[in-house]
Each structure stands twice: as structure tokens, then as C-alpha cells.
């Protein structure tokens, strides 16, 4: 597992990276993560999140535009454990998570806005691999996202940690 330091990436690639507004917190068991972006756009319905974490996620980060909802959790312990089992590097969730005491022990990166104990509805509503924009940054499927306890950033191409 590669360790990323976002300040070092910003220093090494200042013209390449876009930094998200500082509203995310680390809820996962990994201090840092990065990989190729897979996007979901949904609102208080995590059906597509469930579908995606059941697939092979090696080298990928699931970016979930949950509309910034603070009323439901788009990720909990069971889905985080599936994501870890299937090799996902991490998830960036513009929304809430729950089961935070288990998430912090799960080998997957999780950046989200807050915790909330209420689960979502499962209506099968949402869009997969569409361009999404939140926190002042646009996420395009196939681009790259990197996160640590300092922040989250996006790059159009893969980045290497400076030596």
C-alpha cells in the first residue's frame, strides 16, 4: 500500500492538482490513500455504492457525490468491509458515514463530511461514472484522487510521491 502525503504532492505538482475545500474528515483505517476515480452521484440512496464495493477496486477510489446530505449515511461497516475485501483503495463521500468505530479499524480509506446513524433508502436511484462537482473541485472518472489527514486533492494523471 502506497503512502501519500498531500502537502508533498501539492509542492511537487502545484500546477497539476486541485485541492478540495477543507470539509472532509478521515474515518477509515488508512491514514492515506489514492487511486483512479470511479464516481457515483446519488442522494440518500446508497444502492450504487453497495454495487460498486462488491466489484474489484484495486487501484481505484470510489468518489460519491451524495449532495452533501447530513441526514443519512451512505457508508457503514458492512460496505466498508466489502470495499476493503475487494481491494478498493478508499472512498471520498460528499455525505455521511456511520459505524465509525468499526470504519477506523477497516483497511480502507474513508473521507467524508460527518457521521450519522441513520441508513439510507435502497431505491436503486443514482448515476455511475458521471462527472461530479463538489467542494470546489470537479471529479472525472479515470482521473486520480489522493487523500490523507491534511486534505484531498485531484489530478488528471497519476502522481508519484517525491523522493
Curated annotation (Swiss-Prot):
SUPFAM superfamilies reported in the protein's UniProt record: RraA-like
EC number: 4.1.3.17, 4.1.1.112
Keyword Metal-binding appears in the UniProt entry: yes
CDD domains the UniProt entry points to: RraA_family
InterPro entries reported for this sequence: RraA (IPR010203), RraA/RraA-like (IPR005493), RraA/RraA-like_sf (IPR036704)
GO MF annotation: an example: metal ion binding
GO biological process assignments: regulation of RNA metabolic process
Record's catalysed reaction(s): 4-hydroxy-4-methyl-2-oxoglutarate = 2 pyruvate; oxaloacetate + H(+) = pyruvate + CO2
UniProt entry keywords in alphabetical sequence: Lyase, Metal-binding
Residues bound to a divalent metal cation: 99
Domain of life of the native organism: Bacteria
Cofactor: a divalent metal cation
Record text on cofactor binding: Divalent metal cation.
Keyword Lyase attributed: yes
Top class in the EC scheme: lyase
Annotated residues for binding of substrate: 76-79, 98
Function noted in UniProt: Catalyzes the aldol cleavage of 4-hydroxy-4-methyl-2-oxoglutarate (HMG) into 2 molecules of pyruvate. Also contains a secondary oxaloacetate (OAA) decarboxylase activity due to the common pyruvate enolate transition state formed following C-C bond cleavage in the retro-aldol and decarboxylation reactions.
Family from the record: Belongs to the class II aldolase/RraA-like family.
SUBUNIT field: Homotrimer.
The protein, known as: Putative 4-hydroxy-4-methyl-2-oxoglutarate aldolase
Organism expressing this protein natively: Pseudomonas putida (strain ATCC 700007 / DSM 6899 / JCM 31910 / BCRC 17059 / LMG 24140 / F1)
Source species taxonomy: Bacteria, Pseudomonadati, Pseudomonadota, Gammaproteobacteria, Pseudomonadales
